Amino acid sequence: MLKRLSYILAALLVLCGCSKENNENGAPKPELQTFTVAAVIERVQDVRANLDEATLEVLWQKGDRIGLVDAKGNITPALLDDEDAGSASGRFEYQAASAIDIVYAYYPYTGSETCTSGKLSMSLPKVQAHASEGFVAANTLIMAGKYSDGGLTFRNACSVAQLNIKGQESYLRKIQIRCPGLNLSGEGTLDLSSDNPRFITGEVTDASAGVEVNLASDRLHMTSSEAATAYVVLPAGSYNGLIVETLGNTDKTGTASDSDVSLIYKSSKSVTFNAGRVRPLNVTMTLPQNATVYGRVLCGEKPVSGVAVTDGGNLVTTDTDGYYSMSSAKPHGMVYISIPSGYTVRRGYGSVPEFYRYTVKEATVPERIDFELIDDGDQTNHTMLLIGDIHLMGYNSNGNEANRNLTQFNALVNEINRYVADNEDSKIYAMTLGDMTWDSYWIWNNFRIPDYVQISDKFNLNVFCTVGNHDNDLTVAEDWACMADWRRYYGPTYYSFNIGQVHYISLDNVITKNGGTIETRDYNCGLTDQILTWLKKDLALVDKDTPIVVAMHIPLLNISGGTSMSGDNDMKTYKIIDAFFDYSDVTYFSAHSHTLYNNYGEEVLNLNKFRYQPINEHNVGAACADFWASGTINKDLLISRDGSPGGYRIMKVSGKSRQMTFKATGKDKNYFFRAYDRNSIHITAEKYIPKAGPNHKAEYERYLEEYADASSDNYIYIHVWDWYEGWNISVKEGSKTLTVEDLGKYKDPLYMISNMVRKCNVADNGSYTLDMFPLNCQHMFRVKASSATSSVTITVTDPFGNIDVQEIKRPRVFSVEEYAADGGVRTKYVAPSFELDPEMNL
């Protein structure tokens, strides 16, 4: 329908009869009469400014409707007489009780328009149909007319862009055109009273609305020498930075596929489109220079600028229109973003956030990869749950659940989901800190990463995952190759994201040295040069005073504040510390040790800067405690080798401030300590492992230390497992305040009568070495009571004012059953029936 957009409508009124109807009150309704309005084309002279443009012409088509507007703004539709279809003039019929006092008219009429004081509210569609050598005017082209001297003069309120598109050969199935900061479609207004009417779109409130030409049924063939031509209706005006984007492939009949190539054109100067004219625009579509990976980051239709995009080596940011590009060899087979503050992403299978996309083409073949963000609102206040060492093992070969691991993990998932539900107005996220699986059980129980992913899908929140040493395939010798399963199900092994004012980084600090068998499994602590290079690029985008949370599996520092390992590993640890030297607020979270300890403000010598650098690191303990073993003895006492309970850390963030607490699974949120009546503790092999042979007995007794001896000194031992700077402990015996002595690193006796008993209370079968021996806790305290029967009240307060008060009645029994009741007994969960899909196993 290419014809000129100017009309003269001369009013010809013809009266026809209609049937009668009654009003609600019974009175006859006025008879409707049919009136006819004729239209005549007005030619507009060309001017020098339009010499490079073509005259825009339109012929009426069957079914066209116009809107007739009276002085009160009432709108009446009029339909084209079929006999005038294809003509430059036409007759339109409308029905009314009497002839309308026509003031204005407009095209097209859809029934949704409103008019006030000559201002018409209407819409220019975003999606336009393609017509060979032209455009489809219906519901796209906008015209306005004024009544004068017995007729209506229509003038065009829009322009048409004639896109002559060249580029890499392809059959186009979609063309998009847009301009940053301006709407090219959508709701707008048309001043019918103006001598030069213009359709004006509304202000941009979120994303600039563009126009899309759908070519699905009529694909245009584009080559580097032969232009494909398409026409797009646009509001008249001048546009800076106009963008044209095409999508297509070499398959003439194909639909959307992985072979699609998206090409982009950006105008470097202002382009003017005059009303009533066809403006040619010669467009050469190109890929970003040298790009093998490119795309766009959007939130709905809104482009998001400044988003970091990486392939694990290269790191770029999106421009003002959300575009990015990089020359990538696609080393990781994926591209991923650092989620910007205020946004989140879809929660994928296994509760894994979908911030990454896999590449599908060869390294030298360009491909487009887009990312979709979700507006997450104000994240200034949010909560991060940090979960270490889950170690799911599945079922043993006899069909029994190994250490009740799935049942106990289900309890953890249920608890976290309840926490999310109880705080539904809060922003809550989670990070694992490695070892969600156990590589040995990949072989023994055929329980691998995809099985864990299937089960962790029960989490009702996004869970960002960190690599642990047991998440590597021990049957593969090389560090990169042994992470294939991880990359397949979790994406990148190192990445960053932003929530509120905090920058989060997940690092793979396990350098695998496997020999390809269980017996030759080995690893170092540190970052590869590739990760260190990426980390520096990531940090270059972060302000020096931004709070940074670093998640990694192996701790930087051990329980004594020294570096975790020695030799070459020490140097790699120092390189991690050095990368964050210029940043004032860095907190590290780690796991791996299956113990709970904190190094707060620990001064570590930076060998690169030759200056001491304060380190704040929280080793969060293990969700599985002692690999879920103690929970098989008493389901209400899941205890690690240092005596800390199985659980996870809760970090509440407000702006740049953080409050942290350790949450024991199944216990009260303010369960901070355990108190022992030393008079009741006397651990002997005869009492606790009567079935043990001499080798097991000797191994058991090797770790008992002072607890092998009875005591009557009236001491009360207090294990505060999350103690660090800012905690406080107060003990009263009646009105008397007792002196608290810090014993420092010390053994917790409860573990010795829990899993140690299970491991050692068996007959000898040759020599025996205990693999799950007790470890020191970081802070054991004690007070001396006045007698063996005097009770005490212990108050422990964390740095944020949360209090745990326990009244200890003495003598207190020392047993697993006694301490299982501490902190409130957990809800009795029904064991889940995890039916693992065998096809998910690799």
Residue ranges, per PLM feature:
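Binuclear metal-dependent phosphoesterase catalytic core
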Residues: F610-W723, W727-S730, Q778-S787, S791-I808
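A short, solvent-exposed loop/turn motif at the edges and junctions
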Residues: T110-S117, G248-D260, D311, G333-T359
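Conserved catalytic scaffold of divalent metal-dependent phosphoesterases
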Residues: C299, F371-G377, I390-M393, D485-S564, ...
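C-terminal regulatory/interaction regions
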Residues: L704-L842
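N-terminal active-site segment of His-dependent metallophosphoesterases
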Residues: T292, G300, R346-I443, E839-L842
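Extended active-site neighborhood of metal-dependent phosphoesterases/phosphodiesterases
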Residues: S341-G348, P353-E367, Y441-V542, K572-T587, ...
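Sec-type signal peptide cleavage vicinity
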Residues: K3, C18-A291
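Short, surface-exposed beta-strand/beta-hairpin micro-motifs centered on an aromatic residue
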Residues: R91-E93, T229-V232, L315, D319-A329, ...
